[in-house]
Amino acid sequence: MSSDITRQALIAVGLSLLFMAIYILIRFRNVAFSIGAFASVTTTTLMIIAVYVLLWKVMPFTMEVDQNFIAALLAIIGYAINDVVIVFDRIREEIGNHPQGDRFEIVNGALNSTLSRTLNTSFTTFLVMAIVFMFGGASMRSFTFAILLGVIFGTYCTLFVATPIAYEVAKRRREKAATKSAK
């Protein structure tokens, strides 16, 4: 891929990450959720790129950074943000139901209540993409490999990056506000 197309592709990925964070900020009106979502989706994207870099010339199929790879990255960004939105939506709902409750317990409960949905959705998506990877032909392998990685990393980051970061950022903001109001 030429350097101009590569640069434009990187700009497209970067802008999509930025707009996803803005979308979360507007949807949830919460900076902590926006930061958690941005960290999660960015981590997912960087993990996919890292695996491609590490396995380039090792795998028995092409792993070039081409239009298929960029399309897979953009698809995974959308998939991962949808996963994060579902978890954050449940957290917001539970906070609304229990405004005086312990935030850690609320977040943990919301995460647990969406866990089976998250894992089932990821498993079925992974299964379908694994079948496409095996039987879809050589031209599909790079794209489906990136999607397979994205499903794994996206699920991991939703559970273990987005939610903990959002929780910690919100906790620190509450502590800072409490300190400021105590003065």
Q: Which residue ranges define each predicted feature?
A:
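Hydrophobic transmembrane alpha-helices and their membrane-interface caps
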Residues: 34-92
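Internal alpha-helical transmembrane segments of multipass membrane proteins
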Residues: 6-47, 51, 122-133
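Pore- and gate-forming transmembrane helices of large, multi-pass membrane proteins
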Residues: 1-9, 100-136, 145, 151, ...
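Short helix-terminus and kink motifs of transmembrane alpha helices
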Residues: 32-36, 83-89, 93, 138-141, ...
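Short helix-capping/hinge motifs at transmembrane helix termini and TM-loop junctions
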Residues: 27-28, 55-60, 135-137, 170
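Alpha-helical transmembrane segments of multi-pass membrane proteins
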Residues: 16, 20, 74-82, 150-154
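Hydrophobic alpha-helical transmembrane segments of membrane transport and translocation systems
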Residues: 108, 135-183
